[in-house]
Design a protein with these regions (language model features):
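Long amphipathic alpha-helical segments
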Residues: 2, 9-113
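Short beta-strand segments
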Residues: 23, 61, 65, 97-99, ...
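Short, hydrophobic/aliphatic alpha-helical segments
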Residues: 35-51, 158-162, 312-323
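Generic structural signal for well-ordered, non-membrane alpha-helical segments
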Residues: 36, 40-43, 55, 59, ...
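Conserved phosphate/anionic-ligand binding catalytic regions in large, soluble enzymes, centered on
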Residues: 49-62, 95-96, 160, 165-174, ...
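Ligand-binding beta-strand-loop-alpha-helix segment within the catalytic cores
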Residues: 97-159, 191, 195-239
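Histidine-anchored nucleotide/phosphate-binding helix
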Residues: 175-186, 262
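Conserved phosphate- and dinucleotide-binding cores of soluble alpha/beta proteins
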Residues: 190-191, 198-368
Length: 368
């Protein structure tokens, strides 16, 4: 997508052919900073510290993390360590394990002399596949927005509500939930996005608002608790969110607060769609609430807030009393019954076991 008018990806191979460049998302929206990853441990830190985030991008970064490890040491022990270190960084996003399994399959059975080239080749393929998948999601979701636009008066906007950041910053390019939004905008459809701030990390405020602005998509930043009010007053036409894991039964694990948006959407007859790339499906899990591990993050993410001062300094200040007990769950699960449809690269399907297995039979069969 565009940054200051220049086509940009969220992850790339540096000109030296082996180190990996990423955008440091912790610096956005106030500074555009890139970071070079040169070791397995640097890649793991980037994932763990949310320098990069978003399920597809976590997978892509993990893939290159394996490649960096193999470059230093192509032994079986090095491969196993890379797998274990990266898998432990973020437990909820299934793309992480999917990408690591793909890398192991591509590298493990090769002679050591071939492993370096094979690892970098598969990591690059995973990145290109992500772009193709998300482009497919955009094409699948575009008719939904076109249908909503057809009911509007001339020049009246389709209003989309989204939660967290499922944009190109969460993927290699174009994003998942934003893919149909960007395509609609580029097709000249009047579209406007309500972006939840998404406490406590504020990905909606810091990332979604930034990237929508860079692409010229009209948008309004709202507090997390505003969505239900907007829906009650007919100001939201559709909710489109991303996901970090979808179960075989269609339950959706996404950023904390997504479940509340789905409940509000159901109560107000607003369609609730989930943009789902196929690597995010976990056919090994059926009940999302009972089986998906929910990451619990540091208390300071809730008890403090970071922003830019009037003098231009980036500072973190505490907003809760010292010693306050904090619960910081990173994700929640929206039951399949609340999901209008899953927007996949193979079309819009029901959030059900039959629909998922029908659309992706090879992946469903591999999980048995």
């Amino acid at each position: 997508m565009n940054v200051n008018g220049k086509a940009t990806r969220s992850i790339w191979l540096e000109p030296n052919g082996w180190s990996v460049g990423v955008i440091d998302q912790t610096a956005l929206p106030h500074r555009l900073v890139t970071m070079r990853l040169t070791t397995l441990d640097e890649a793991a830190h980037a994932i763990r510290a949310m320098v990069i985030r978003g399920a597809p991008l976590i997978g892509a970064t993990a893939a290159y993390g394996v490649a960096l490890a193999v470059r230093e040491d192509a032994s079986d022990e090095s491969l196993e360590r890379a797998y274990a270190v990266l898998l432990a960084t973020r437990p909820t996003a299934i793309n992480l394990k999917w990408a690591l399994d793909e890398m192991m399959a591509a590298v493990r059975n090769r002679p050591r002399a071939e492993r370096n080239a094979a690892a970098y080749r598969r990591a690059a393929e995973i990145c290109e596949e992500d772009i193709a998948i998300n482009t497919g999601i955009g094409r699948s979701g575009l008719p939904l927005i076109e249908a909503l636009a057809a009911r509007k008066k001339p020049r009246e906007c389709v209003n989309v509500l989204t939660h967290c950041n499922a944009g190109w910053l969460a993927a290699v390019d174009i994003g998942t939930a934003t893919a149909p939004i960007y395509m609609a905008h580029d097709h000249g459809i009047p579209i406007h996005v309500f972006a939840d701030e998404t406490r406590p990390r504020n990905q909606g405020a810091s990332l979604t608002a930034w990237e929508l602005g860079q692409h010229g998509v009209p948008h309004t930043l709202i507090a997390d608790n505003t969505g239900g009010h907007l829906m009650q007053h007919g100001l939201v036409d559709v909710v489109i969110v991303g996901t970090d894991r979808v179960t075989a039964n269609g339950d959706v694990c996404n950023k904390i607060g997504t479940y509340l948006k789905a409940l509000a959407a159901r109560d107000n007859n607003v369609p609730f769609y989930v943009a789902l790339p196929s690597p995010t499906i976990d056919f090994a899990v059926a009940d999302g609430v009972a089986e998906i591990p929910i990451e619990q993050r540091a208390a300071d993410e809730v008890a403090t807030v970071t922003g830019r001062t009037a003098e231009g300094r980036i500072e973190t200040v505490r907003i809760a009393p010292d010693g306050t007990s904090v619960a910081n769950y990173g994700f929640d699960v929206t039951p399949a019954r609340l999901v209008t449809g899953l927007i996949t690269e193979r079309g819009v399907i029901a959030a059900s076991r039959a629909a998922l297995a029908g659309a992706f039979p090879k992946r469903a069969g591999a999980a048995k």
